[in-house]
């Protein structure tokens, strides 16, 4: 779809959506997004120019259907997939991608760390994906030197970052905000550093006694990104891994640096979103969102959860969806899903489904709470179908139609029950919606009550 859009841009020094927006040009991607979001193209351009909205759209991802992440647009959901040294293969990851897209993932991150050829699995995912693909390049940087921190150089990081851009990756998690002076602040935490990318860079800095190379070479990374229109997803290496560690000095020190880096990327007209926690008590979620907006000049916020309790292994998709809904309500732009396998193992296809639906609920609830135009239309339509016992319409409007139909049919499988004016919960005699009271009857009752009140 995008080949004809991209062709005139080839060879230009800066092909980012932000660069076009700041020069007053509405790209085809901006126009496409405006139609999807039911917003004026001029508003999309203004928000991209301001940095409050991003359109992750690498010029080499030609089959991409552009989408937007920002407070002006709907709250989005990301799904993580990826092979590990102990499980998965390329075909399985492509199937996870297709499942994630089927159940509504707005973006997908390939977090493969081994077990397969990382370049091949990434290329296969990009070729099959209509949604933006994100990656974490430090994983492959370490894998490229066979896990040897002492052999890992600054140029190794930049080489892998550019390779991901060349393949068509739309956004990359760059852990540039973790500085060597932040590391002592981790002392006193229960779970230390829980970011894999952050852990790699912490080891690198401790081993070499040097500043984070992604920070010192940040301008070089910007130069790479603007050639391909790859978007920064600034990683939060010091995100809290438990409630005890939430909103501590380490997390907030890194957040301040992420704000500095956001503005540096904008000087290059490169798009940015900022990643956030993690594990956060409910009473601290609003503070975390507001603090990010303040420090990072309202760049889109992208949070993992957050989980609101630490005692829910096997059900972390529920614990985190609670926090995600709150974060979305307060202004977070994208929610990274958590599956039931979080903290326990590599998710399978069913885990991807469970996590995605939980997060689609959270994002949708946030859009309703923020009074986005049309956000509740589908809910109202389903409610009308429910009141009229239109079972097939109810299934169709559900976030997971297959699951809704499956649960209904467990007790009433025959087709005749798709027209029944009851379900197995109340049965035919006790459903309150079965005894419908007409508007005419209610008007008559109102008149009589008013008569009684007047004559009393």
Curated annotation (Swiss-Prot):
It catalyses: 5-amino-1-(5-phospho-beta-D-ribosyl)imidazole + S-adenosyl-L-methionine = 4-amino-2-methyl-5-(phosphooxymethyl)pyrimidine + CO + 5'-deoxyadenosine + formate + L-methionine + 3 H(+). The keyword S-adenosyl-L-methionine applies. One of its GO terms (biological process) is thiamine biosynthetic process. Substrate binds at residues 80, 109, 139, 175, 195-197, 236-239, 275, 302. Catalyzes the synthesis of the hydroxymethylpyrimidine phosphate (HMP-P) moiety of thiamine from aminoimidazole ribotide (AIR) in a radical S-adenosyl-L-methionine (SAM)-dependent reaction. Its cofactor is [4Fe-4S] cluster. This is Phosphomethylpyrimidine synthase. Keywords: 4Fe-4S, Iron, Iron-sulfur, Lyase, Metal-binding, S-adenosyl-L-methionine, Thiamine biosynthesis, Zinc. [4Fe-4S] cluster binds at residues 423, 426, 431. Zn(2+) binds at residues 279, 343. One of its GO terms (cellular component) is cytosol. InterPro entries: ThiC, ThiC/Bza_core_dom, ThiC/BzaA/B. Binds 1 [4Fe-4S] cluster per subunit. The cluster is coordinated with 3 cysteines and an exchangeable S-adenosyl-L-methionine. Belongs to the ThiC family. Pfam families: ThiC_Rad_SAM. It comes from the Bacteria. Its EC number is 4.1.99.17. One of its GO terms (molecular function) is zinc ion binding.
